[in-house]
From Swiss-Prot:
GO molecular function: proton-transporting ATP synthase activity, rotational mechanism
Name of protein: ATP synthase subunit delta
Chief location: membrane
Function recorded in the entry: F(1)F(0) ATP synthase produces ATP from ADP in the presence of a proton or sodium gradient. F-type ATPases consist of two structural domains, F(1) containing the extramembraneous catalytic core and F(0) containing the membrane proton channel, linked together by a central stalk and a peripheral stalk. During catalysis, ATP synthesis in the catalytic domain of F(1) is coupled via a rotary mechanism of the central stalk subunits to proton translocation.
Entry-linked InterPro entries: ATP_synth_OSCP/delta_N_sf, ATPase_OSCP/d_CS, ATPase_OSCP/dsu
Subunit structure: F-type ATPases have 2 components, F(1) - the catalytic core - and F(0) - the membrane proton channel. F(1) has five subunits: alpha(3), beta(3), gamma(1), delta(1), epsilon(1). F(0) has three main subunits: a(1), b(2) and c(10-14). The alpha and beta chains form an alternating ring which encloses part of the gamma chain. F(1) is attached to F(0) by a central stalk formed by the gamma and epsilon chains, while a peripheral stalk is formed by the delta and b chains.
Species per Swiss-Prot/TrEMBL record: Clostridium botulinum (strain 657 / Type Ba4)
Protein backbone atom coordinates (compact mmCIF):
# COMPACT_ATOMS: atom_id res chain seq x y z
CA UNK A 1 0.00 0.00 0.00
CA UNK A 2 2.80 2.40 0.89
CA UNK A 3 5.28 1.09 -1.69
CA UNK A 4 4.89 4.23 -3.76
CA UNK A 5 5.69 6.38 -0.72
CA UNK A 6 8.65 4.16 0.21
CA UNK A 7 9.95 4.51 -3.33
CA UNK A 8 9.67 8.32 -3.22
CA UNK A 9 11.59 8.55 0.04
CA UNK A 10 14.23 6.13 -1.26
CA UNK A 11 14.59 7.99 -4.55
CA UNK A 12 15.03 11.31 -2.74
CA UNK A 13 17.79 9.89 -0.53
CA UNK A 14 19.39 8.11 -3.49
CA UNK A 15 19.58 11.36 -5.44
CA UNK A 16 21.26 13.09 -2.47
CA UNK A 17 23.69 10.17 -2.20
CA UNK A 18 24.49 10.41 -5.92
CA UNK A 19 25.07 14.16 -5.72
CA UNK A 20 27.55 13.57 -2.90
CA UNK A 21 29.14 10.48 -4.52
CA UNK A 22 28.25 8.44 -1.44
CA UNK A 23 25.71 5.87 -2.67
CA UNK A 24 27.60 2.87 -1.28
CA UNK A 25 28.23 4.63 2.03
CA UNK A 26 24.56 5.60 2.39
CA UNK A 27 23.40 2.06 1.63
CA UNK A 28 25.85 0.64 4.17
CA UNK A 29 24.84 3.18 6.83
CA UNK A 30 21.13 2.60 6.25
CA UNK A 31 21.61 -1.16 6.61
CA UNK A 32 23.36 -0.59 9.92
CA UNK A 33 20.60 1.69 11.18
CA UNK A 34 17.93 -0.82 10.11
CA UNK A 35 19.78 -3.59 11.96
CA UNK A 36 20.16 -1.47 15.08
CA UNK A 37 16.44 -0.65 15.10
CA UNK A 38 15.41 -4.26 14.39
CA UNK A 39 17.69 -5.70 17.06
CA UNK A 40 16.99 -3.18 19.81
CA UNK A 41 13.81 -3.66 21.79
CA UNK A 42 14.44 -0.39 23.59
CA UNK A 43 14.59 1.67 20.40
CA UNK A 44 11.43 0.00 19.08
CA UNK A 45 9.62 0.72 22.36
CA UNK A 46 10.71 4.36 22.25
CA UNK A 47 9.57 4.74 18.64
CA UNK A 48 6.20 3.12 19.31
CA UNK A 49 5.55 4.77 22.68
CA UNK A 50 2.65 7.22 22.32
CA UNK A 51 3.71 9.37 25.28
CA UNK A 52 7.20 10.08 23.94
CA UNK A 53 6.78 13.06 21.67
CA UNK A 54 8.35 13.45 18.25
CA UNK A 55 10.87 16.02 19.46
CA UNK A 56 12.20 13.66 22.10
CA UNK A 57 12.41 10.79 19.60
CA UNK A 58 14.39 13.04 17.27
CA UNK A 59 16.73 14.00 20.13
CA UNK A 60 17.32 10.33 20.95
CA UNK A 61 18.09 9.51 17.31
CA UNK A 62 20.41 12.48 17.04
CA UNK A 63 22.29 11.29 20.14
CA UNK A 64 22.45 7.72 18.83
CA UNK A 65 23.52 8.39 15.26
CA UNK A 66 25.12 11.86 15.18
CA UNK A 67 28.72 10.70 14.71
CA UNK A 68 27.89 7.29 13.25
CA UNK A 69 26.15 8.24 9.99
CA UNK A 70 26.39 11.03 7.44
CA UNK A 71 24.49 14.20 8.38
CA UNK A 72 22.20 13.81 5.35
CA UNK A 73 21.19 10.32 6.50
CA UNK A 74 20.54 11.64 9.99
CA UNK A 75 18.34 14.37 8.48
CA UNK A 76 16.52 11.68 6.49
CA UNK A 77 15.93 9.65 9.67
CA UNK A 78 14.62 12.73 11.48
CA UNK A 79 12.19 13.44 8.63
CA UNK A 80 10.94 9.86 8.87
CA UNK A 81 10.41 10.30 12.61
CA UNK A 82 8.56 13.56 11.95
CA UNK A 83 6.32 11.84 9.37
CA UNK A 84 5.87 8.78 11.63
CA UNK A 85 7.48 6.49 9.00
CA UNK A 86 10.69 5.51 10.82
CA UNK A 87 9.39 2.03 11.68
CA UNK A 88 9.24 1.39 7.92
CA UNK A 89 12.87 2.29 7.29
CA UNK A 90 13.64 -1.22 6.05
CA UNK A 91 11.16 -0.79 3.19
CA UNK A 92 12.92 2.42 2.16
CA UNK A 93 16.26 0.61 2.26
CA UNK A 94 14.89 -2.16 0.01
CA UNK A 95 13.58 0.41 -2.45
CA UNK A 96 16.92 2.22 -2.42
CA UNK A 97 18.69 -1.08 -3.15
CA UNK A 98 16.30 -1.65 -6.08
CA UNK A 99 17.08 1.83 -7.42
CA UNK A 100 20.80 1.08 -7.10
CA UNK A 101 20.40 -2.13 -9.11
CA UNK A 102 18.29 -0.40 -11.77
CA UNK A 103 20.73 2.48 -12.21
CA UNK A 104 23.66 0.08 -12.49
CA UNK A 105 21.93 -2.27 -14.98
CA UNK A 106 21.82 -5.09 -12.45
CA UNK A 107 19.10 -7.46 -11.32
CA UNK A 108 18.75 -9.67 -8.26
CA UNK A 109 18.19 -13.40 -8.74
CA UNK A 110 17.10 -15.46 -5.73
CA UNK A 111 18.11 -19.10 -6.02
CA UNK A 112 16.99 -21.92 -3.71
CA UNK A 113 18.65 -25.32 -3.74
CA UNK A 114 19.00 -28.22 -1.31
CA UNK A 115 22.79 -28.12 -1.46
CA UNK A 116 25.05 -25.20 -2.38
CA UNK A 117 25.66 -24.67 -6.09
CA UNK A 118 29.04 -25.66 -7.42
CA UNK A 119 31.21 -22.83 -8.76
CA UNK A 120 30.60 -23.97 -12.36
CA UNK A 121 26.82 -24.20 -11.83
CA UNK A 122 26.75 -20.73 -10.28
CA UNK A 123 28.75 -19.24 -13.17
CA UNK A 124 26.56 -20.96 -15.77
CA UNK A 125 23.37 -19.78 -14.07
CA UNK A 126 24.68 -16.20 -13.85
CA UNK A 127 25.66 -16.30 -17.53
CA UNK A 128 22.29 -17.68 -18.71
CA UNK A 129 20.27 -15.27 -16.61
CA UNK A 130 22.51 -12.39 -17.70
CA UNK A 131 21.86 -13.26 -21.35
CA UNK A 132 18.12 -13.58 -20.77
CA UNK A 133 17.70 -10.29 -18.89
CA UNK A 134 20.58 -8.42 -20.53
CA UNK A 135 21.74 -7.24 -17.10
CA UNK A 136 24.44 -8.07 -14.61
CA UNK A 137 23.08 -10.73 -12.27
CA UNK A 138 23.47 -10.51 -8.50
CA UNK A 139 22.90 -14.05 -7.24
CA UNK A 140 21.39 -14.48 -3.80
CA UNK A 141 21.60 -18.15 -2.80
CA UNK A 142 19.50 -19.89 -0.17
CA UNK A 143 19.62 -23.47 1.05
CA UNK A 144 16.10 -24.89 1.43
CA UNK A 145 15.76 -28.59 2.32
CA UNK A 146 11.98 -28.47 1.79
CA UNK A 147 12.35 -28.37 -2.01
CA UNK A 148 13.79 -31.93 -1.87
CA UNK A 149 15.83 -31.44 -5.04
CA UNK A 150 16.20 -29.30 -8.13
CA UNK A 151 16.40 -25.53 -8.25
CA UNK A 152 14.04 -22.60 -7.70
CA UNK A 153 14.96 -19.26 -9.30
CA UNK A 154 13.14 -15.94 -8.86
CA UNK A 155 14.17 -12.88 -10.88
CA UNK A 156 11.82 -9.97 -10.27
CA UNK A 157 8.34 -11.34 -10.95
CA UNK A 158 9.63 -14.27 -13.03
CA UNK A 159 9.82 -17.69 -11.37
CA UNK A 160 11.50 -20.82 -12.67
CA UNK A 161 10.46 -23.69 -10.41
CA UNK A 162 12.34 -26.86 -11.24
CA UNK A 163 12.04 -28.31 -7.75
CA UNK A 164 11.20 -31.89 -6.97
CA UNK A 165 8.66 -30.83 -4.33
CA UNK A 166 6.66 -28.88 -6.94
CA UNK A 167 6.78 -31.77 -9.40
CA UNK A 168 5.51 -34.16 -6.71
CA UNK A 169 2.66 -31.78 -5.86
CA UNK A 170 1.75 -31.55 -9.56
CA UNK A 171 1.73 -35.36 -9.88
CA UNK A 172 -0.44 -35.63 -6.77
CA UNK A 173 -2.93 -33.11 -8.22
CA UNK A 174 -3.06 -35.06 -11.50
CA UNK A 175 -3.68 -38.32 -9.68
CA UNK A 176 -6.41 -36.82 -7.51
CA UNK A 177 -8.13 -35.36 -10.59
CA UNK A 178 -8.35 -38.79 -12.20
CA UNK A 179 -10.10 -40.34 -9.20
Amino acid sequence: MYEYLDRRYALALYEVAEENNKVDEYLKDLKEVVNIIKNSEDICKILKHPEINTSRKKEIFTELFKDKVDDKILSFLLVLIEKDRILYLEEKLKEMEKIYLEKNNMILANVKTVIPLLKEEREELIEKLGNKYNKKIILEEEIDKSIIGGVYVRVGDDVLDGTLSTRLKDIKKMMLKRE
